[in-house]
Design a protein with these regions (language model features):
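Hydrophobic, ordered structural segments
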Residues: 97-121
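Contiguous, well-ordered beta-strand patches that form the walls/edges
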Residues: 36-44, 50-106, 154-160, 170-247
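Edge beta-strand at a domain terminus
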Residues: 112-147, 178-179, 224-247
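Bacterial N-terminal signal peptides
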Residues: 6-15
Length: 247
């Protein structure tokens, strides 16, 4: 009986030891949940991203020593070095390395000369394993920022129920069946201080300026003040829709 008990305790102990390294494996997709939570408060989108960014998602594979991230407009490929005293170093071609560590259930990107300290959570979004880098963050952001039911208060389709889906579809908004939020890059440069999104119906689409204030979402035509040979500089024109989020 004592031998059986001893063997059982040994098995439990060894099992615990064997599983310990798995808890230190940072493989997987990590998203900037802090940026999403800030955006979900219903204010300016890019302000929330900039305040908690700049990086939005990490995709890490310790087996292949790959660690890639996106900041919303570029994908950066890195090489993951073995853990050293709780720190994983990621090296990049032509750029300074970045250090990562774990703090509880968070992946921490250590502050550097180029970037502030950032925290990331494992993505719970269910997507295909080959989903493009950044897709997990975008799905989670769209659900948090534009999820739920909206009602057209004014504009074409007044009274319609509008739904923005996480995969980029929009239902109930006349003249559009797909949308994309501008997170960073050229679209952000073109819209300057304003938040913008792309609305599309089948093959035809256009940029729009939007203003989010709590439960209200205003969508405006995007007018261009730039000269023909300059990068577009968008600003809000006529308001096309006023939407209100339903409780």
């Amino acid at each position: 009986m004592r031998n059986v008990l001893a063997m059982s305790l040994l098995a439990i102990f060894l099992g615990g030891c064997a599983s310990a390294p798995a808890s230190r494996d940072i493989s997987g997709v990590w998203i900037n949940q802090a940026a999403i939570d800030e955006a979900a408060k219903g204010g300016k989108l890019r302000e929330a991203l900039l305040a908690n960014g700049p990086n939005l998602e990490w995709a890490i594979d310790s087996q292949t020593a790959k660690a890639n991230y996106t900041n919303g407009f570029e994908w950066v490929e890195g090489k993951l070095m073995p853990e050293n005293s709780g720190v994983w170093q990621v090296s990049f071609y032509g750029s300074p390395s970045t250090d990562l560590s774990l703090s509880g259930n968070q992946l921490i990107q250590v502050a550097s000369d180029d970037d502030p300290r950032q925290s990331f959570m494992r993505s719970t979004v269910n997507l295909a394993s080959d989903a493009p880098l950044g897709t997990h963050f975008e799905h989670a952001l769209k659900s948090a920022y534009l999820g739920g039911q909206w009602r057209v208060i004014s504009g074409k389709g007044q009274g319609n129920q509008v739904t923005f889906l996480a995969d980029g579809q929009v239902k109930g908004l006349p003249g559009a069946n797909a949308y994309a939020l501008c997170l960073a890059g050229d679209c952000a440069s073109m819209s300057g201080e304003f938040d913008s999104l792309w609305l599309q119906e089948d093959e035809l689409g256009a940029a729009h300026i939007f203003v989010r204030k709590g439960r209200q979402l205003e969508i405006f035509q995007a007018l261009d003040s730039a000269k023909p040979d300059e990068m577009p500089q968008l600003y809000p024109g006529k308001r096309e829709w006023l939407l209100e989020k339903q409780l």
